[in-house]
Amino acid sequence: MSNHVIVIEETFNAPVEKVWEALTDKDKMKQWYFNLDDFKAEKGFQFSFPGQGHKGEQYIHLCEVTIAEPLQKLQYSWQYKDYEGYSTVTFELFDEGDQTRLKLTHEGLDSFPQHPDFAVDSFRGGWTHLMTISLKDYLNKVS
């Protein structure tokens, strides 16, 4: 597997329906993910949100849902306004009864400019925090 691909798997003590809601309901997403103005798990839906780099730089994330299979798979493009590069983020859900295994894959990272904020380690750190701390804490609260 390319070192420009991030794969993180985490098992949550929550049914697949709760995990899907956390990934697709904008009000729930705001509690663990990013502050999105709107989000719909529908192919073709476009959304954007601000983010901050290591030194305070502001970035606008530009995304479009490319796959939305309820309770199974969500994928969207991930780009930055005014920067080259195109990547995809995929969330795959595996129903394990009272638990859900979630596999996150972020591909295409080598298409971004050579910059510390776009480094694979930066993305890996961000996704690891979101999956193993933010989302896990959120689901533990609501399940």
Placement of each model-derived feature along the sequence:
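Tryptophan-centric aromatic hotspots in well-structured domains and transmembrane helices
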Residues: 20-23, 32, 78, 91, ...
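Hydrophobic-ligand binding "helix-grip"
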Residues: 38, 55-99, 107-110
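A short gly/proline-enriched turn/hairpin at secondary-structure junctions
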Residues: 6, 30-37, 49-55, 77-79
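Hydrophobic ligand-binding cavity/cleft-lining segments
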Residues: 1-38
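Short coil-to-beta transition motif at edge beta-strands of beta-rich domains
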Residues: 42-49
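A conserved amphipathic terminal alpha-helix motif
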Residues: 108-143
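Hydrophobic pocket/interface hotspot
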Residues: 19, 29, 47, 65, ...
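Residues at helix-coil transition
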Residues: 24-25, 70, 132, 140
